Amino acid sequence: MIGEKHGSGAMFGALIVSGIYVILVSGVFSKVANLFPSIVTGSVITTIGLTLIPVAIGNMGNNVDKPTGQSLFLAAITVLIILLINIFTKGFIKSISILIGLIVGTAIAASMGLVDFSPVAAAPIVHVPTPFYFGMPKFELSSIIMMCIIATVSMVESTGVYLALSDITKEPLDSTRLRNGYRAEGLAVLLGGLFNTFPYTGFSQNVGLVKLSGIKTRLPIYYAAGFLVLLGLLPKFGALAQIIPSPVLGGAMLVMFGFVSIQGMQILARVDFANNEHNFLIAAVSIAAGVGLNGSNLFNSLPNAFQMFFSNGIVVASLLAIVLNAILNHNKKEK
């Protein structure tokens, strides 16, 4: 929208400023950790998983109105492969079940003539990204305000991602770690503006990947980051990711997002519902609103800034759970 109205320069300029904004407010924003007891955390993480599942279903059907039998077969075989690996294997093989499912599913699709290799053929062998490739940034006030609002929404969503990872890895999430996470996102957004690309935020889909793989240390992430940098310099290899058929990807996503939902439910199982009926209200309202409003057109008549807030199910669930918990449980301590 910014690019259409003010040009690409204004869009990238707004990205740069919003990245700086996230870095500057990260310290203040990180103080929200105490607002996330188990009832809030469980509700938010459950909502993350449930709002992502329709994305997986759409991909399984190749995102068309009338999915073909081939699409359904590829999605089902991918899910089956991942399940069999998780049931009958252990250790390293089990941890890469998603990768194996994607590779085997893509190979089967290729044997059926459903894989388009043209992106690999069209990609250059080597490409070095250059700053301001599409022109110098322009700093237009309304675009900057809009992008800072979007960045704030992303920070709320990322908080839910950090909470989910904290529960999976059993690592405590304090204000310092939250601040560092926000700063990393701000730096990524800033670099995105400098290199004329997209803003980068915490990817909630990866929570399921962490849960399913069982990898809970940061070292593999460093290796993966280096590998992605290499792929960015060698576009032909990077283009290989583009040839994965949507149904195959959807099958893998279905398993991952299901894991995210269950992770949230496990947290809710630790909440005291028996002696505190208010917790029922908090979980019920926040999850129902988050799942129901995600991507809906209910607020299309409102200004764009409000639409961005209220059409993001994770943000809605987070805000509702925090506010309801603060009101209903303000004089109760979490056990």
Regions found by a protein language model. Give the residues of each.
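Membrane-interface helix termini and inter-helical loops of multi-pass transporters
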Residues: G58-P67, D116-F134, F237-I243, N297-M308
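Early transmembrane hairpin of solute transport permeases
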Residues: M1-A75, I243, P247
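Hydrophobic core segments of alpha-helical transmembrane domains in multi-pass membrane transport
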Residues: V17-S26, S43-I57, L74-F88, L99-L114, ...
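Transmembrane helix-loop boundary segments of multi-pass membrane transporters
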Residues: E4-G7, S30-S38, P67, N206-A224, ...
